[in-house]
Design a protein with these regions (language model features):
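A well-structured
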Residues: 1-163
């Protein structure tokens, strides 16, 4: 029976069978920096609460910010998750995954007002927002899907409780 290789031994013996995560982040330090950057977005959603129906521009700015945060958060989480999967015995990478997961929960909770508040906008007004703002047209399909959920979405407080 052969002896099981350690993670380092396996990486040395089979370098082509190891994920190259430098395409996501060059280093763990770059990951840490990106994680902090995403954390710095917490609280920026407050400027949009209660104002999504004010104008097409406000709605677009909220959706664009939430989209940007989501993109960065996904990158952070994928790196952390794959690092943990590389070596589940490494506490450092288990911590990375845990911190990234906790950040997902915080961001999701912070933005939980978004869909219920969009649904508070009258359907005709929402349609006029989309028609009047070329940037917002990028989110037309998403807004259509949200609108189809009108009968099934709770108010903002109840949605936050569920997240």
């Amino acid at each position: 029976m052969s002896q099981q290789l350690t993670r380092e031994e396996q990486e040395r013996k089979y370098p082509n069978e190891t994920w190259d995560l430098t395409t996501i982040f060059e280093s763990d330090e770059a990951f840490e920096k990106a994680l902090k950057e995403v954390e710095s977005y917490l609280g920026k959603e407050e400027q949009f609460k209660g104002h999504l129906g004010d104008s097409a521009k406000t709605l677009y700015n909220a959706l664009a910010l939430e989209d940007e945060i989501g993109t960065q958060l996904e990158k952070v989480y994928v790196y952390a998750h794959l690092k943990q999967d590389q070596d589940t015995s490494n506490d450092k990478y288990t911590g990375f995954e845990s911190r990234a997961h906790q950040l997902i929960i915080k961001i999701s909770s912070a933005w939980s007002f978004l869909v219920p508040e969009i649904l508070q906008i009258d359907e005709e007004k929402l349609e006029s927002f989309i028609k009047s703002n070329d940037d917002l047209k990028r989110y037309a399909f998403d807004l259509k899907l949200i609108n189809e959920k009108r009968p099934h979405i709770l108010d903002a407080d109840k949605e936050k409780l569920l997240t």
